Structure formats: structure tokens, C-alpha cells
Amino acid sequence: IMGAGGIGFDVAEYLTQSGPSTSLDPQAWAAEWGVDTAYRQAGGLTEPQEEPSARKVFLLQRKDSKVGAGLGRTTGWIHRTVLKNRGVVFIAGAVYERIDDAGLHVRVGEGSTVLPVDTIVLATGQEPMRDLYAVLDESGADVRLIGGADVAAELDAKRAIKQGTEVAVSI
């Protein structure tokens, strides 16, 4: 998976889970996280039942920072832990060189490697699309640009909701 933002992490979780998400089944969730719901163990904790993925997944980002550093402060560690437990390989500072029959060629630091992949998922960000806005604005229509159409980098739902609310109140 090229791109380790929120969408890249969500796709990695989806691709590495077997069956329905454990978040839909309280007993499966408790087992995955080592929660002893019967309190047979001290502190109500037991050994987590990790389920490695049947797929080999690489999660790459171009930034040198910690993979997933831009995820939510209160949930980022959860997403990183789930993927780590499923055997996902995190690669930061990746320079994408090419894709061929051998796989994805990347350079990390001074070394180059080929990741032997048969499928590549692009979660590499988005570009704002302002074409319609420009046409409507030039025509004199009362239009506003908000959310990802305004700033697509690191989409921020709170910012988009705030902007949408402000526009709605002003109408």
C-alpha cells in the first residue's frame, strides 16, 4: 500500500483481517486485545490472541517520520498495533522507483530493494478539484469552497464539518 495516511491504514486493516472485523463481535474483540471478560486473570487481562494475516502487506510512506504519525492522537496507536500484530511491514522514507514484474522497486535511505508484490494499492493523497467552483464563482453565483475541495492535504473531517456548519449558518 503506497500511502500511510488514514486511508492507507484503513485499507491495510481491511486487507489483513480474516472474516468480519472483531469490532463487530465483543468476544472476538476481547480475545484480540487480551481482555478477560470473566475476570479469571489478575487485572482482567490475558494473553492477546493475535491473528497474523494470510497476506503479506507492506505499508509505505514517503515521509521519514514514524508511519502513522498523522493518525488521531487517541486512536493511532490502536491502528498501528493491529497492523503490527497482523505482520504488516511499515516502511518510512520510501522513494518509489518503478513497478515491474519483479514487484515494487523502492529506495529507503541509501539502499534499494524490490518488494515482491502482485498488487499495489494507491492511497497517496488527493488533489483539490476546483474547476466547477471557478466556473460558478466567475458567473457570479454565491458559492463556497470547503473541506477537501478547499484543502485536500491531510483531510480533516473536523475542519470540513466546521466549515460546512459555518456556511449553513451564514445562508
Where are these regions (language model features)?
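Short, well-ordered coil/turn residues at beta-beta hairpins
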Residues: 2, 117, 123-124, 147, ...
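FAD-binding beta-loop-beta segment adjacent to the flavin cofactor pocket
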Residues: 126-144, 149-155
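Beta1/beta-strand and adjacent pyrophosphate-binding region of the FAD-binding site
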Residues: 1-7
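Residue-level signal for short, function-critical loop segments
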Residues: 5, 63, 149
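Internal hydrophobic alpha-helix adjacent to the cofactor/substrate pocket in enzyme cavities
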Residues: 12-27, 59, 139-146, 158-171
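A Rossmann-like FAD-binding core segment of flavoenzymes
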Residues: 9-131
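Ferredoxin-type iron-sulfur electron-transfer modules and their immediate structural context
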Residues: 6, 126, 134, 158, ...
